[in-house]
Amino acid sequence: MKHLLKAGALVALACIVTLTAGAQAHAAKRINIRLAHPMAPGNNVTVGYEKFKELVAEKSNGRVRIQLFGNCMLGSDRVTMEAAQRGTLEMASSSSPNMANFSKQWMVFDLPYITSPEHQQKLYKAIDDGELGKKLDEIAASIGLKPIMYSEYGYRNFVTTKKPIKTADDLKNLKVRTTDSPIEVAVAAALGMAPTPISWGETYTALQQGTVDGEGNTFSLLNDAKHTEVLKYAIDSAHNYSMHLLMMNKAYYDSLPANVQQILTEAGREALTYQRSITSELEKKAEDAFIEQGITVTRLSPEERAKLVERTRPVWDKFKDDIPAELIKLVQETQQ
């Protein structure tokens, strides 16, 4: 009888150990990935990352969990991208202008009027499946990062808090907020403005307090971030195209199992397709919201737009030694 009791106890203990080990093994397989970005709730970039999180969970059956920290919760895009580069954060998202802090080659998209909305689909194809995308991946790898999504951001437009703007000349003498991108600063100067680099999280206060008179950004982001509360005038300058680059620390990515890497890249592509499909609609809704809130939006005439192109063209020559000619050519080929 005693032998039977001992045998039963051993079987029970074995079952407990097996179940505990199984639970521990399952827990060990779970992967938590933190993703930090500066964008406001409802913005197309934010919506894209929410879709990415959803797809990763679905494709991994809950094994991989993306934790989103938006709206500058963990710091500006520069701060969080530096953390991702160091490996103290798994993923971060930065606007393409701010990526100039990490490699000047990212400034190619900051060149004024290098791309146009009418050729957007060709640009997408080159980034997703062409030589341009391969080159961008190489640039990221050289600074210790792995691209997951070349997120759609959109075309930047100039807006002001006080001074009406309807022409290229109206931009002169404006104190304008810029990113740290040297090209963005140079573009503002070429148009006669006084450029003032300010982090995104501090821009609303700078506009409110009069530190700057205006800024350049997408209508959708400005509306989502409630900058419309202090803005009065806008023009559809569309002077440069920006992306929000979702990057992962490359060493961390390389350490992940191959099937998890595949889940992340597939989810990134699918989320990007979804994000691009809603961006135009969100931008149009934002422009309508501008008007509803009393902001005067001026559509530039072809003549005034030509003045902006002409006045900013010298910026290209100023930075020709910082951006490889091959990279500029790859972008220009998408505009033909």
UniProtKB/Swiss-Prot annotation:
Keyword Signal set for record: yes
A Pfam family assignment: DctP
Disruption phenotype: Cells lacking this gene lose the ability to grow with isethionate as the terminal electron acceptor.
Signal sequence range: 1-23
One Gene Ontology term from the biological process aspect of the record: transmembrane transport
InterPro entries registered for this protein in UniProt: DctP_fam (IPR018389), TRAP_DctP (IPR004682), TRAP_DctP_sf (IPR038404)
Transmembrane annotation, as ranges: none
Keyword Magnesium carried by entry: no
Cellular compartments annotated: Periplasm
Substrates-to-products reaction catalysed: 2-hydroxyethane-1-sulfonate(out) + Na(+)(out) = 2-hydroxyethane-1-sulfonate(in) + Na(+)(in)
Sorted UniProt keywords: Periplasm, Signal, Transport
Family listed: Belongs to the bacterial solute-binding protein 7 family.
Functional summary from the UniProt entry: Part of the tripartite ATP-independent periplasmic (TRAP) transport system DctPQM involved in the uptake of isethionate (2-hydroxyethanesulfonate), which is then catabolized by enzymes encoded by adjacent genes in the locus. The DctP subunit is the solute-binding protein. Thereby is involved in an anaerobic respiration pathway that converts the sulfonate isethionate to ammonia, acetate and sulfide.
Subunit details: The complex comprises the periplasmic solute receptor protein DctP, and the fused transmembrane protein DctMQ.
Name this protein carries in UniProt: Isethionate-binding periplasmic protein DctP
Gene expressing this chain: dctP
